[in-house]
Amino acid sequence: MHTRATSTAAVAAEAARACPSCRSRRLEAFHEHRGIPVHSCRLVSTADEALAFPRGELSLSFCANCGFITNTEYDGSLQDYSVAYEETQGFSARFRQFSEELAARWVEEFGLHGKRIVEIGAGKGEFLTAMCELGDNFGVGIDPSFVEERLADEHRSRMQFLRELYGEQHVGLPADAIVCRHTLEHIHDVGGFMRLVRQAAENNPTAVVLFELPDVVRVLRDVAFWDIYYEHCSYFSTGSLARLFRDSGFEVLGARLEYDDQYITLEARLGQGSDTPLAVEEPVGALADDVALFRQSYAETIERWRDQLAEAAAAGERVVIWGAGSKGVSFLTTLGVTVEIAFAVDVNPYKHGKYMPATGQRIVAPEFLREYKPDLVIAMNSIYLDEIGAQLESMDLQPRLLGV
């Protein structure tokens, strides 16, 4: 038994040293953070539960061969994606507009009318619902966090949801489009996952494959530490994502940066196309420079934010963050914030009355601020500053408003 265990551990260690995207052995560690919450979007019912939230280790490595960035200490067994996972961003009018416009663009660009759409990581089904409505399509959504009660009755005849993780049992589903948004970054073995997507495409050779996920270049250049957390074990640029698709047997039809350059969208089909990089793809060397910049500037960025919060506390100011999702969790845990900030504001009503994992701030509705009257509001995504400012103004509140 001991010999077998040692052998298994050795195999696992060797696998951990290989890039999950291209399998090269050119991983270079550049950033680590110990004891961070293993989930950012799970609903936590009490402050005690929040403070005792399970934690894991983060050690980011950059692949000098393909540009992919991975958490080499990621342990998927620590996570549990279920109906207690609340990732919905659609309660923001700004995000909802972007999502609906993207759905409309894909439906029209790829002629998805009266077609079959399979969405991997469909969440609560909002995006799949939009694609089905816009093109009179039939959709199958796959996600362990799907909540049946959140699907309106009028959509049930044209949509089916499977509350499970995507796997080999799904590659035979008929599909004219295979959609995957904000899911690949949660998967450690990205090469293995793309082999499943390749199998699905081989079973549906005319299907278009449509992906959306965060862009790591902005994270590195802006030293956006709030966008680094345990759930995101895989980080892509447009170049590293396109290289993974080509290596997986896909022709990349297009790629672009969206949503204030925060997200990558990529469209592909089965087959070997040109190996010439698209204009939006950066070379690996340029990404290596961005990694170096992040590494050099990280400590200074953390110190600057800690100083700002300390000054607010010394002045007796009331400070809240706006955005109780992953960015908010990472912002608070990275800075070690506890009593300096008592509340996290969020527009998602399903989060109200819950608590932030690891740091324990209570999550409140925007209306709570009428009585609390904060002096400083820190928006966890600057793209929402106008939206947040308008809500504060509607409540006759005039705090300082900062964006990360």
Regions found by a protein language model. Give the residues of each.
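N-terminal juxtadomain amphipathic helix
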Residues: 2-94, 256
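Short, glycine-/aromatic-enriched active-site segment of Class I SAM-dependent methyltransferases
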Residues: 38-41, 211-234, 238-242
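Extended interfacial segments that mediate partner engagement and assembly in macromolecular machines
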Residues: 51-151, 163, 229, 234, ...
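Hydrophobic, well-ordered beta-alpha structural blocks that scaffold small-molecule cofactor pockets
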Residues: 105-106, 130, 267-404
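Conserved SAM-binding strand-loop segment of SAM-dependent methyltransferases
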Residues: 155-168
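A conserved beta-strand element that flanks and buttresses the S-adenosyl-L-methionine
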Residues: 179
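A short glycine-rich, Lys/Arg-flanked "PGG" loop and its adjoining helix->strand segment in the class I
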Residues: 191-208
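Conserved beta-strand signature within the Rossmann-like core of class I S-adenosyl-L-methionine
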Residues: 205-214, 403
